Amino acid sequence: MEIFLTSISGILVILGMILVGFVMGEKGWFDDKSRGLIAKLVTQIALPCYMLYTITQRFTAADLLKMLPDLRFPALSMVILLGIATAVASIFAVKKERRGLFISMFFNSNTIFVGLPINQALFGDASIPYVLIYYMCNTTFFWTLGTYLIQRDGEGEAEFDLKTSLKKIFSPPLMGFMLGLVIVILHIKLPVFLASDLQYLGSLTTPLSMIFIGLSVSNAGVKQLILKKDQLLILLGRFVVAPLLMAAIVYWAPLPALMKQVFIIQSAMPVMTNAPVVAKLYGADSDYAAVMVTETTLATMVVIPILMVLMA
């Protein structure tokens, strides 16, 4: 019961901030441009600062080097999920014009905007390195295979652009993480004033991320949140297949219990918030992607407490 209440408490913290964003959206305080500004503040300023501060202040070189080989666990999970998603799309006759988007949303999860704050709320800062391991793998898969699949749905032939993909993979958050790694490995100590700046800016990550999700829910409109076949299959993939698969992969592995829990929670996160943006860019079904981001984000509030109890 205590575990359930703890997980509910963590979710309520997140839900409260999402509600603030939703109310502001309903009041018309933010237009498309200002919503984009919040997303840019999070991904290009707050999150890189948060990564850099957290890595340099809380971890040693030995801690970080020991964790890098564990990338193989989320990588294996995503490869298998990709195969399952492809089979499901074929068996259940998902529309060809949204099949690539469907597969991408099935096997990729929102590991930062939602995953990081939820893991922090549930497990504290000790979960951050494990969150980042999953994030590194997830973002690489999304900006390569995921983007290619979405582009294939859109107008014209899909092309794999290595330069563009590398630019997306090495995003500001990942660069902040990698810079933090270098600083820790080289035993460089940040000046106190710089560490404080990073801490203040990094602390914006969680509230701004949750407000952005609330604004997105408001923008999509509650009436659009209907459950049809394609929506139900994504929900099944995100919240049943993915966590069960990850649990099966890590169950016998000699990993810390916290790492196993974080990996399972990360695998059960909602659809990536970048999916609608990429879909819009390539002429795919961006409305479908936006609805799935909203539905899966809302469903997370129910799923995570259940997962916490099952993992106890």
What are these regions (language model features)?
Residues 1-312:
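Alpha-helical transmembrane segments of multi-pass small-molecule/ion transporters
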